[in-house]
Amino acid sequence: MNNNVITRFAPSPTGFLHIGSARTALFNYLFARHHNGKFLLRIEDTDKERSTKEAVEAIFSGLKWLGLDWNGEVIFQSKRNNLYKEAALKLLQNGKAYYCFTRQEEIERQRQQALENKQHFIFNSEWRDKDPSIYPTDIKPVIRLKTPREGSITIHDTLQGEVVIENSHIDDMVLLRADGTATYMLAVVVDDHDMGITHIIRGDDHLTNTARQLAIYQAFGYAVPSMTHIPLIHGADGAKLSKRHGALGIEAYKDMGYLPESLCNYLLRLGWSHGDDEIISMTQAIDWFNLDSLGKSPSKLDFAKMNSLNAHYLRMLDNDSLTSKTVEILEQNYNTLLRHLPYREEFGGNTERSTAAYIDIREDASTGLTYKLPLAVELPKKFKISEQEIGYIKQAMPSLLVRSETLLELTRLAQIYLVDSPIIYSQDSKEIIENCDKNLIKQIIENLSELEQFDKESVQNKFKEIAAANDLKLNDIMKPVRALITGMTASPSIFEIAEILGKENILKRLKII
């Protein structure tokens, strides 16, 4: 083990913790932990206009939820500008950089001219070798790197191999802006050196930046960290990952009911493998992770595989843990987890509980993927599940679990057992209720009322008797009964639900018709 290994995750706080960024963080974390090294966190917030505190908090909470704990204090680039300024001035003094007074308007004019001439634009500053004695006093200059005009830069990448870039294709990039703030390129190099980063693992979309950063490394005389640029995650159709493919923040996956252990396992397998192993615990991942097993081709986001893997991890939890997680979600997010249909008083229930929000199900016709997007609405009153309801959910958990791949699906089914809440009827179940034989439902109520034993076998036998007496198939009777009792068209066994909820609750739901 090499305990001198230091990796870093360096997101920009301009939005949520993207799933691709989470995978990058995971790979850096695993590599550091495998070598008993350090995994550092740096927030690249030099873009003051786009960086937000909310995004910083989303990054922190996302990493913590995934279990990717970092070493030491978080580094904020916005607090280190003096360090960057000193570094830029050092290059200036050593003849590796220069003051440039060219106005932005002139640069844009040259860029437009190159575009019109269908030429690749590389800005060549007239101030590169000017004598300081002729510097203007009415213009605030930027500091530019004096990139060598001859030769080339070679990127030694552990995954991509050697990538050679001619110096003539690298511009004299700005290191320090006219207002004295550092650019991304300078800050990254100075920070990686100052933090002692030994290995950089990031997306291959950074590969073009790497050549420019290596030019800065050379100017300073810094040792270059080991570079590994991993292919990006693509959508199921092979296109670059976007929101329509599921390029959501980690918080969204949490809200959709994925477990952190499952998501880490899934992200690990997106571009890394260990033989034929699919189920890999975090402990195993730390033991096994290496850069040699990274794939060179982009991985495709596959929700079916993600769901299947999550179902496996759900089934590894014991009944108490599953019940606790389900109850917690119901209590904290009841208003965003259950599909809403306009409440009708005749459908009964405790009207103090909210039915004011839903999960919006949207299907992308181009990909066939279905997305569940939580819509936040405030609860009018605090929602608290009773001990009796918790008991119902715990008793029903085995049958709920076999029908669920995510905590969201599990919670959706568990709401059947909230006897003090109004039933939330799907549109299909409402249509079944409105079109059903009301006299048949009354007959069912009368027959069930007479039952002394209300276990699932007795209830099932009674329904068979009713079906035979009316010359109907059992399924024909169960459709409206299921809709009335659960608000759904598909659910766990009605006979099991009846046994758990008991006669009084079942009759109450049937009588709302």
Curated annotation (Swiss-Prot):
Q: What does the record give as EC number?
A: 6.1.1.17
User: Where on this chain is 'KMSKS' region (motif)?
Assistant: 240-244
Q: Which Gene3D superfamilies match?
A: 1.10.10.350, HUPs
Question: Keywords of this protein's UniProt record, alphabetized?
Answer: Aminoacyl-tRNA synthetase, ATP-binding, Cytoplasm, Ligase, Nucleotide-binding, Protein biosynthesis
Where this protein primarily resides, as one coarse class?
A: cytoplasm
The record's section on SUPFAM superfamilies has: An anticodon-binding domain of class I aminoacyl-tRNA synthetases, Nucleotidylyl transferase
Question: What EC class does the entry list?
Answer: ligase
Sample GO molecular function, one term: ATP binding
Q: Give start-end ranges for motif 'HIGH' region.
A: 11-21
- GO annotation, biological process: glutamyl-tRNA aminoacylation
Function statement:
Catalyzes the attachment of glutamate to tRNA(Glu) in a two-step reaction: glutamate is first activated by ATP to form Glu-AMP and then transferred to the acceptor end of tRNA(Glu).
Q: Which family does it belong to?
A: Belongs to the class-I aminoacyl-tRNA synthetase family. Glutamate--tRNA ligase type 1 subfamily.
> What is this protein called in UniProt?
Glutamate--tRNA ligase 2
